[in-house]
C-alpha cells in the first residue's frame, strides 16, 4: 500500500512485489483443483515471449469470472498502491506448478476488491477455470511510473542503508506497512551473547524525517539514524 507518511515523507508503494508473503489464493480455489500445468488451450501462446529477467509476481488467478473466458484475480496490491501494474500491463506470464506460459491480456479492470481480466484465447468458463491457481507475473519495466518521491518496495529491497556519517547500518531485507507509513526492516551482521554470529535487525520508518536520500543508482538509502538506536 502507498505510504501515508507525515511531513516531507518519502513514499514506498507496497506490498513489495517480488518479496512478500503471497495471499493464500490456492485455498480460495475449488477443492480438487490440481497444481499442474496451465491448459495450453486456455491461453494463446507466443513462443517468442520467453520468461523476462525482470518478472515480478503481482497476483494470482483465483477463479473464473462469468462465461466468456474472463478470470478473477487476487492482486498483491490495490490500484493506486502498486496494483496498477496488474491492471495496466498487457503482457502476463503465468506459472502453475512447473509450467510457465505467456498470455496477452485484452482487458483488465477492477471488480469490487478484486481484478478481473480476459486473457486472449480464453474463450469460455472452462478455459478460464483451467487457469485457476496460476501465479501472475509482469515485467518490472511495465510498472506505471511513479512520482519522484515514490518508490516500489521491490526497488528498495537489497539496498544498503547508511547514516549521514557514512556508517553502514545494513541492507533492507523487507518493507513493512504499519497502516500509517512504511518501515524498512534492515538486517546487519551481529554477534550473539554466546559469541556466535547472528543477524541483527533494525526497524527504520520510511519517512522524510529519517530518510534523507534514496540513491538507487548508488544502491543505498541515506538515513538520519545512529547504529546504537
Swiss-Prot record:
Record-level Gene Ontology MF annotations: ribosome binding
Single GO BP term: ribosomal small subunit biogenesis
Domain PRC barrel: 148-229
Entry superkingdom: Bacteria
Keywords (A to Z) from UniProt: Chaperone, Cytoplasm, Ribosome biogenesis, rRNA processing
GO cellular component, one term: cytoplasm
Family matches, as Gene3D superfamilies: PRC-barrel domain, RimM
UniProt-annotated location(s): Cytoplasm
A Pfam family of this chain: PRC_RimM
Entries under PANTHER family matching the protein: RIBOSOME MATURATION FACTOR RIMM
Subunit structure: Binds ribosomal protein uS19.
Function noted in UniProt: An accessory protein needed during the final step in the assembly of 30S ribosomal subunit, possibly for assembly of the head region. Essential for efficient processing of 16S rRNA. May be needed both before and after RbfA during the maturation of 16S rRNA. It has affinity for free ribosomal 30S subunits but not for 70S ribosomes.
Similarity comment: family membership: Belongs to the RimM family.
Domain comment (free text): The PRC barrel domain binds ribosomal protein uS19.
Protein name: Ribosome maturation factor RimM
Species: Burkholderia pseudomallei (strain K96243)
Amino acid at each position: 500500500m502507498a505510504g501515508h507518511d507525515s511531513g516531507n515523507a518519502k513514499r514506498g508503494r507496497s506490498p513489495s512485489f517480488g518479496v512478500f508473503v503471497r495471499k493464500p489464493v490456492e485455498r480460495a480455489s475449488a477443492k480438487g483443483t490440481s497444481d499442474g500445468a496451465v491448459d495450453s488451450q486456455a491461453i494463446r501462446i507466443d513462443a517468442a515471449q520467453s520468461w523476462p529477467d525482470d518478472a515480478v509476481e503481482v497476483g494470482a488467478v483465483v477463479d473464473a469470472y462469468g462465461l466468456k473466458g474472463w478470470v478473477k484475480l487476487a492482486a498483491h496490491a490495490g490500484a493506486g498502491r502498486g496494483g496498477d501494474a496488474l491492471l495496466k500491463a498487457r503482457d502476463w506470464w503465468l506459472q502453475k506448478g512447473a509450467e510457465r506460459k505467456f498470455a496477452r491480456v485484452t482487458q483488465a479492470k477492477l471488480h469490487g476488491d478484486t481484478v478481473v481480466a480476459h486473457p486472449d484465447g480464453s474463450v469460455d468458463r472452462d478455459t478460464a477455470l483451467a487457469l485457476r491457481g496460476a501465479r501472475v507475473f509482469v515485467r518490472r519495466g511495465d510498472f506505471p511510473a511513479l512520482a519522484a518521491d515514490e518508490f516500489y518496495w521491490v526497488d528498495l529491497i537489497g539496498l544498503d542503508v547508511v547514516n549521514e556519517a557514512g556508517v553502514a547500518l545494513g541492507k533492507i531485507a523487507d518493507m513493512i506497512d504499519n497502516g500509517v507509513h512504511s518501515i524498512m526492516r534492515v538486517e546487519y551482521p551481529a554477534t550473539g551473547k554466546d559469541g556466535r554470529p547472528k543477524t541483527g535487525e533494525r526497524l527504520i520508518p520510511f519517512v522524510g524525517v529519517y530518510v534523507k536520500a534514496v540513491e538507487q543508482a548508488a544502491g543505498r538509502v541515506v538515513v538520519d539514524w545512529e547504529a546504537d538506536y
